[in-house]
Amino acid sequence: MNFGFIIYIIGWLLNFQGAFLLVPCIVAMSYGERSGFAFLISSVISIIIGMICTRKKPKNRSFYAKEGFVAVALGWIVFSISGALPFIISGEIPDVFNALFETISGYTTTGATILSDVESLSKCLLFWRSFTHWIGGMGVLVFMLSILPLAGGNNMHILRAESPGPSVGKLVPRLRSTATILYAIYAALTFIEFVLLLLGGMSLFDAVTTAFATAGTGGFGIKNSSMAEYSMYIQNVVGIFMVLFGVNFAIYFLLLIKKPKEALKSEELKAYFGIILVSTVVIGFNIKDSFSSIWVALQQAFFQVGSIITTTGFSTVDFNTWPALSKTIIVILMFIGAC
């Protein structure tokens, strides 16, 4: 086991974390919040430890599957601990375990929260919660691979360990280019959603945090009512992008290189959209008596189906009040997941 090189990778991870932690400081300054100092302190701690770990390149750069899994496992642990520091230092979530829970939920895009009143948090911490979704949605080590050739030709071991699916492959011969393409698509979709939300009348802060939470399919909301208080236009934009972020990014790559026929031949994509369509129609007609029209019922059904099948977790209604058939479909969709 090449522990020296693993520590080197963890060090770079902390350096990146230090940079990420500085972003909410901008939000804090914009709103005049003292919690911004918590991010500044956390950033300095992360960067100092990161610089210590990376001050000397290890001579032994051999890196195999076992090192890849260990690096990813340790990376997520270190990232979660350092990411929880702002909650603890600011005193807004003083309990260590609660702060860790909130941070881990963010990075893993689980979306579960210990907060009963989300709106009581400062803006910079609300931003950080959503930002952890965006960072974790694609995987921070994938982001690192797109910038740094850390493990030379053995980067694939990191990518395989980082990816949650049964298999992962290269989009192009160079793995670093693959990681760059993945993040470029991810960032582009996030930006498009952000712009559409702004056009719908959302505030700049709400649009950024909602786009981050949607992209990571995590669903950390900044309102206690989740998405219920927003307009139907906003809900539709978020619903569509939840579904789009659930699509295998390899399909988007095929569209980018002008191979739409090959992309549309994907059995995975057909099954994904087919399940969403059928579930939306069945639930929509099943709940139509609870809404003003069938179109509103279908819109609400589509939003909840998209939210559940992609495991995002945003909500616009209390679907626990829906008929048994609709609730059964919702539960089944939880186990299916997206592409």
Regions found by a protein language model. Name each.
Residues 1-339:
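Membrane-proximal intracellular helices of multi-pass ion channels
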